[in-house]
Amino acid sequence: WIMGHMVNAIYQIDEFVNLGANSIETDVSFDDNANPEYTYHGIPCDCGRSCLKWENYNDFLKGLRSATTPGNSKYQSKLILVVFDLKTGSLYDNQASEAGKKLAKNLLKHYWNNGNNGGRAYIVLSIPDLNHYPLIKGFTDTLKQEGHPELLEKVGYDFSGNDAIGDVVKAYKKAGVSGHVWQSDGITNCLLRGLSRVKDAVANRDSGKGYINKVYYWTVDKRATTRDALDAGVDGVMTNYPDVIADVMNEAAYKNKVRLATYEDSPWVTFKK
């Protein structure tokens, strides 16, 4: 999965997919009442990027739905996965469950079209703080209460705080999650980070008794870092330059080892070599 980083304006969806991304990451900010409000990152953000692009969250969802609904004039068949980077740092811990409920209602209405031929992309809810694990239960309970438990097949989870893997597993157990787990590791492109935790996550994924289904690394903008990440066995790389990742995947060392994921590749099933 080539994951376009910080896609917060509707026009950027096409821009990143046309550069080679089959997945995007979108920031979600919340208001004081735990309502998802804007797709907005803010300052500071990655070096070389504008931090200030934004849409109203519901408008973005409608644009995303158009881009991921077969038959729509704006349909992009390659776009199969969306990571919502939930900026829950602005919320009190006791608002996490409420944020999950509201997120579920927004997605159900504006993205899934109340279960009636909505967008088809898989969704990953990425949460920066392990203490906000109740967001997951708020989300899953709400979809069930609204009569659409089947949509949970399209939803996965990620804790993005670079916490110890054991602590992440404990948070998932508390949230009642036993699958659909992506594990992120990384740092802004302005700084360097080693791959030791990525390798730990990959080992957990491949152990057969681990908790992790997929591993992605962020933010990867350079060819050398891309090669290191692919060599470490990641499933996804998040990038500001999807074309760079696509170029590396076409190099002789990789073109027979890795390929771009398609809609038929489940993002929840660990890939067996």
UniProtKB/Swiss-Prot annotation:
Active site: which residues? Answer: 5, 41 (nucleophile)
**Is Metal-binding a UniProt keyword of this protein?**
yes
A Pfam entry, by short name: GDPD_2
What detail does the entry give on cofactor binding? Binds 1 Mg(2+) ion per subunit.
Q: Which residues of the sequence carry a binding annotation for Mg(2+)?
A: 25, 27, 85
Enzyme class comes to lyase
Disulfides per UniProt: 45-51, 47-190
Catalytically driven reaction(s): an N-(acyl)-sphingosylphosphocholine = an N-(acyl)-sphingosyl-1,3-cyclic phosphate + choline; an N-(acyl)-sphingosylphosphoethanolamine = an N-(acyl)-sphingosyl-1,3-cyclic phosphate + ethanolamine; a 1-acyl-sn-glycero-3-phosphocholine = a 1-acyl-sn-glycero-2,3-cyclic phosphate + choline; a 1-acyl-sn-glycero-3-phosphoethanolamine = a 1-acyl-sn-glycero-2,3-cyclic phosphate + ethanolamine
Give the enzyme's EC designation: 4.6.1.-
Cite the record's tissue specificity text. Answer: Expressed by the venom gland.
The Gene Ontology biological process terms listed for this entry are: killing of cells of another organism; lipid catabolic process
Q: Which UniProt keywords apply?
A: Cytolysis, Dermonecrotic toxin, Disulfide bond, Hemolysis, Lipid degradation, Lipid metabolism, Lyase, Magnesium, Metal-binding, Secreted, Toxin
Q: Which CDD domains match?
A: GDPD_like_SMaseD_PLD
Q: What GO molecular function annotation could you give as one example from this UniProt entry?
A: phosphoric diester hydrolase activity
Name its cellular compartments. Secreted
Q: Which Gene3D superfamilies match?
A: Phosphatidylinositol (PI) phosphodiesterase
Per the record, its GO cellular-component terms are: extracellular region
Cofactor annotation = Mg(2+)
Superkingdom classification of source: Eukaryota
Tell me which family the UniProt entry assigns to this protein: Belongs to the arthropod phospholipase D family. Class II subfamily.
Its biological purpose: Dermonecrotic toxins cleave the phosphodiester linkage between the phosphate and headgroup of certain phospholipids (sphingolipid and lysolipid substrates), forming an alcohol (often choline) and a cyclic phosphate. This toxin acts on sphingomyelin (SM). It may also act on ceramide phosphoethanolamine (CPE), lysophosphatidylcholine (LPC) and lysophosphatidylethanolamine (LPE), but not on lysophosphatidylserine (LPS), and lysophosphatidylglycerol (LPG). It acts by transphosphatidylation, releasing exclusively cyclic phosphate products as second products.
Protein name stated in the entry: Dermonecrotic toxin LhSicTox-alphaIA2bii
State the taxonomy lineage: Eukaryota, Metazoa, Ecdysozoa, Arthropoda, Chelicerata
